Regions:
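Non-heme Fe(II)/2-oxoglutarate
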Residues: 1-75
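Catalytic core of non-heme Fe(II) oxygenases with the double-stranded beta-helix
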Residues: 94-165, 202
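A short hydrophobic beta-strand segment most commonly corresponding to one strand
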Residues: 115, 167, 183-198
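Short beta-strand His + acidic residue motifs that chelate non-heme Fe in jelly-roll/DSBH
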Residues: 173-182
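Double-stranded beta-helix
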Residues: 191-213
Length: 213
C-alpha cells in the first residue's frame, strides 16, 4: 500500500454549518434505525440510509455530491462515481454506546469519506500499519470473528472533531471505528465512492448486506 491510506481535513465545515447539520439530524431522528450487527459480526450503530437521505435530506446528499466528492476525486487522482448500492452509498451513522462501532475490516468500495458532525464520545477511526494491511488483505475475513487478534498489531488512530473530513482508501487499508467514552455521541455523514463505471462485486455486496442492512 504505497499510497497514503487516508487524508484528514480539519474544519472542512464551518461551525455554523456543522451546527445546522446536527440540528437537521435531530429533526429527522424518527428515521434512525438501530443496526445490531447480524450474528454478532456486523457493525453496530443507528443509521439513516441512502434512500431516506435522497427522499428527506437533500442537503446531506448535496454536501456529498458538491463538496465531498471533488476532494475525494483529488485524493484518488481519478474520476469517481457513487457506490453502486444506493442504500449504502450515503448514510448518517450515529454511535452513542461503547459497544457501537465497526470491527476491523476492508470496504467493498475503494474510497469512503466521513464528515464528522459531532464527536462527544471520543470516537476514533483506527488503521492497521500499512505493512499489516498488505499481509492480511486476504486473511481479514477468516479472522473477522476474532478481532482481538488484529487489535494486537500496530495501528494509527485518527480522532476527528466536529466539521472535519476523513477520506480513506477503505478497500486496501484495514480499519475500524471505535467508541471510547461511555457518554456522548458521534454523528457521521458517510459517502462511499467507486471508480467511475465500476459495478460492485455481487458476492461482496451480498455479504455486506447480510452483515449490515
Amino acid at each position: 500500500m504505497s499510497q497514503t491510506a487516508y487524508l484528514h481535513v480539519e474544519h472542512f465545515l464551518s461551525p455554523a454549518e456543522t451546527s445546522s447539520f446536527g440540528a437537521l439530524v435531530d429533526e429527522h431522528a424518527g428515521l434512525l434505525r438501530e443496526i445490531a450487527g447480524r450474528g454478532g459480526l456486523g457493525p453496530r450503530y443507528r443509521v439513516i440510509d441512502g434512500d431516506q437521505i435522497r427522499a428527506m435530506l437533500p442537503s446531506v446528499e448535496g454536501l456529498g455530491r458538491e463538496r465531498v466528492r471533488p476532494l475525494v476525486e483529488r485524493f484518488a487522482g481519478e474520476p469517481l462515481g457513487a457506490f453502486g448500492s444506493p442504500r449504502r452509498a450515503q448514510r448518517v451513522q450515529i454511535y452513542s454506546r461503547p459497544e457501537q462501532g465497526f470491527r476491523w475490516h476492508r470496504d467493498g468500495h475503494p474510497y469512503v469519506a466521513l464528515v464528522t458532525i459531532e464527536n462527544g464520545n471520543a470516537g476514533q477511526t483506527q488503521f492497521l500499519a500499512p505493512a499489516w494491511s498488505r499481509i492480511l488483505r486476504y486473511l481479514i475475513y477468516p479472522l473477522y470473528p476474532v478481532p482481538q487478534l488484529l487489535s494486537l498489531l500496530p495501528r494509527t488512530a485518527v480522532t476527528c472533531g466536529p466539521g472535519d473530513l476523513l477520506i480513506m482508501r477503505g478497500q486496501v487499508a484495514i480499519h475500524r471505528g471505535v467508541t471510547l467514552a461511555a457518554i456522548g455521541r458521534r454523528i457521521l455523514f458517510v459517502y462511499a465512492f467507486d471508480r467511475d463505471g465500476h459495478r460492485p462485486n455481487p458476492l461482496r455486496d451480498l455479504i455486506a448486506r447480510r452483515l449490515n442492512y
